[in-house]
């Protein structure tokens, strides 16, 4: 790999307040805070700019910032996917790009909000750029019985659940922008992220497990089988498991096929 392949220009933490589909209270026309990160890999790297100390040979992030503000400000968007399309249309030519949009208050049940990402990379075989799309719901607050110790079997303890979903960007964007539900197409930026978070809380509350591994796997099953995603990676933090650490926990990733080919157990209830 060329040394210039890792050269990047970025903007972090662009803050806007606009309509990007339903807010956490499911109101379709209410503005909400959004945070945007942009990463660009320049087509010819940054060598020329470094050698000549000349900004004309690089991507001017000052101009990029002004262009993004002009494109996004004073607009409303049907959903986050629509916003990402407008942002990506504003980007200069680059070898690769990454766009991440965070809704810090987009989900009532998730203290860490929800983040959507779009990253391009060229196929090794044909050179055609493919866009990987991710959705991360962070810090879903839950309480349940989980653990082997006697005291853990008596009282529910607080858990923080984060869900990471990844796939190739859906090609049916006209249908998505028309409001087709997650049950019809698997785009990751529809308001189904709220339904995912709420269903996790509903299932976990009142459940009982001896291991956090079993609980995380059960949540993977819920996200893939019930919500139709091809894969899910679930992280569970147990802040009160060990007094001397901030949190203990696990991360488990499973595909929908994993559960389709075996008789996995249901959510265990107390």
Predicted regions, residues:
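N-terminal, polar/charged subdomain of small-to-medium soluble alpha/beta proteins
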Residues: 1-270
